[in-house]
Every structure is written in C-alpha cells, then in structure tokens.
Amino acid sequence: MLQKWKRCCKIESCYIADYVRRNEENKMAIVTTTEMFKKAYEGGYAIGAFNINNMEIIQAITEAAAEEKSPVILQVSAGARKYAKHAYLMALAKAAVEDTGIDLALHLDHGADFEICKACIDGGFSSVMIDGSHYSFEENIEVTKKVVEYAHARGVVVEAELGRLAGVEDDVSVANDDAIYTNPSEVEEFVSKTGVDSLAIAIGTSHGAYKFKGEAKLRFDILDDIAHRLPGFPIVLHGASSVIPELVTEINECGGNLSGAKGVPEELLRKAATMAVCKINIDSDIRLAMTAGIRRVMTAQPDVFDPRTYLTVGREEVKKMVKHKFTAVLGSNGKA
C-alpha cells in the first residue's frame, strides 16, 4: 500500500494532516475522519461508527455502506482485539475496502492508554480514541496530548472523552453512581491544550443493552452549550444503540433472556445528528441483530449444524439494521 499525504485541513485553530492509505490504483482507501466530520457537521447528519468482531459483521456493515452510499467508520474495541487479533481485523478491513470499493475509517474504540493507541497507530489504524475519562481533568489532558502528538506526526486523528458514561461493554464498566455528565465549561480548555480532533461527551447515553430504567432522556442543553463553545467541532456520542425492540422480542421468543433491555430512542439520536454530533457509536444493536438471526435459525431448524447457514442469516440481519441506521437515524445515506 502506498502512503499519501493530502492537504492539511483546518479544524478550528488546529491543523492536522488528512492521512490516507490508498492502493496503487487510488480507487479505495482507509481514510481519516477529518473530511467525513467536516461534511457531516455542515450537512446536519452523523457518521455511524460500528463495532466489528468478525468477518460477517464487517461484510454486513461495508456492504450496507456501499449500497446506501454512506460514509462509515469501523471501530475496534479492546475486546475485539483480544477475540479476533489485530492482524486479522486489519486484513479483514482491507479486504472489505477492496471488495466493496468504498472508503472507510478504521478506529480504535476506548484506547485505555498510550501504548494501545501507539500499537494501533503503528498497525495501520487511521483514527484512535484515548479514553482518559477515568483520570482527573489534568491527567486526562496529559495523556490525551501525548497520544495526539504521536498520532498527528503520523497522520492519524484522535478522539478523546470528557465525562463518563454508565454501563458495561467489553472492558468498559462504569457504575451509574460513577457516571458524570460532561462539564461544558471544561471543553474549550481541554481541546485547546490537547489538540484533539473530536470529543466524546456524556449527555445521558450509556453502554450496553440496559441504558434507561425510566423515560429515556438526553441532555441536549449540555450538547447545545458545548456546540456554542466549540463551533464547528465534531462531537461524538458513545453508547448510542437503540436496542431495537423487535430484535429483543425475537431473541426472547427464541430462548433468550433480555428482560428490561432498553436503548436510546431513534428520534433522539436523529436530533443529535442534526446538531454538533458527527459520530454515533453503535455496538449493542449489531450484537442483537446477529443474535436474533442466529437464534431464529437454530430455533426453526434445530438440526442445522453448518455455521454458514446461521451466520448468513445473522449477517443479513446486521446488514438490514445498518442500512436502517444510515437512512432513518444518521441521515448519512447518499453522502459518500
């Protein structure tokens, strides 16, 4: 793969290199999120960042993106790297780019420290998240700045987090009592001192399939305040699966036990996408779609033991769900 440097793009007062890895024919690429976010902010839509764990999920997401002509981010959690290994996921992402002919960003989700971010930067990722939200404000700035300096020198962009989301997902576990809304008065100093390219904030979403006990609410007042303080700056929402009720129902009817599972209503996510939110993370809905498809086959055809049979159905369920997100929630279809 050839490495090419595109023109520098300005995000507020910070310049970053729009780093691109392209094949020799220059037809397809793993790209940064710089141009994606710029267009999304101006266009009033958001980019879906979908967590990947295996070949079928990658195929489903990228085929959906190609068919809907939507920009897309594939993101890898610590759990995914442990399960599938970096080399396999990197190769699968490149294969998906070659097969579908789309551009995509490859992002590290919830990088726990500098070393894991460095490994992903050196290993071909175009974007990384350093999650210093469990540190003090000053320590978060310090570790984020270190990652930013290393990443930008190599053409990779960086996402950071202010505030803490509740919930459990892979290696991320935060009790409800430890969740903290993002303080808008801190964002300008944080972005200025770190040089970070996008910021994940806490406004009421949470990780996992059990996001709300009562009425689902998001603090749009916090989002609006931050948007006014950081005009044009890309904001990220984590824990933004809708925990699609139809999928939960089917899983439960096919022997599952997801009683009380509840996600973020799609209308709230669509509203966020029309504001400053340029990236919306989706993981639980992928797991639910895959599981519903597999359980459907195993329940209706208990004699099936060929993994291709039930994984094909699971893949199609994920693809259908992702296409729905592009068109009805993110508003990103036709924007690639």
Place the predicted regions along the sequence by residue.
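Short, Lys/Arg-enriched N-terminal segments with co-localized hydrophobic residues
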Residues: C8-K27
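N-terminal amphipathic alpha-helix/helix-capping segment at the start of soluble metabolic enzymes
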Residues: M28-G48
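Alpha/beta enzyme core
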Residues: T33-F37, N54-Q75, G79, Y88-T100, ...
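Histidine/acidic-residue-rich catalytic or RNA/ligand-binding cores of hydrolases
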Residues: Y88, K211-E215, P245-N252, A273, ...
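Long, repeat-rich segments with strong aromatic
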Residues: L237-V243
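C-terminal alpha-helical cap/extension of soluble enzyme domains
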Residues: E253-L258, V264-A336
